[in-house]
């Protein structure tokens, strides 16, 4: 387990636990509702067993500010169906960043990237990566402003192994090189 603390705003990054399960899904639902208002690709209902596995394997994370979950996300060291041949690279992959609406606009992606850089080094990884679906221009620009390099669009070949929102077969890929 890797925990980060930002003393300026008392932000803590730590692993989610099963006690956070309902809150994680509440934040996923809030993210989907927000996506609906922006006319972008909307997240589906995610598999509860997937999230339980991520929690059990210490791959589900949260930002906590004053005892409130402000943001959640998941990590993995492999993402073959999205990154295909680049999956062989030593990388941390970030998935499903969902922000508590009360904390929207706090630039958690910057904090997550800062944390992920340290986490990657501790785990002998050389890249921090994430992806998004659809043509959400503002989100693409936001990830770039946060420090990620936009690598372009990948035309996915094995979408049957991915959640429903990947059905278009196109993923926007982002990377930070350590």
What positions do the PLM features span?
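Conserved GNAT acetyl-CoA-binding A-motif
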Residues: 120-132
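Short, Lys/Arg-enriched N-terminal segments with co-localized hydrophobic residues
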Residues: 2-10
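A conserved short alpha-helix in the GNAT/GCN5 acetyltransferase fold that borders
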Residues: 104, 113-121, 144
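C-terminal "cap" of GNAT-fold acetyltransferases
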Residues: 133-135, 146, 156-178
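A short beta-loop-alpha structural element at the N-terminal edge
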Residues: 12-26
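Acetyl-CoA-dependent GNAT
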Residues: 18, 29-102, 110-115, 177-178
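Conserved acetyl-CoA-binding loop of GNAT-fold acetyltransferases
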Residues: 143-153
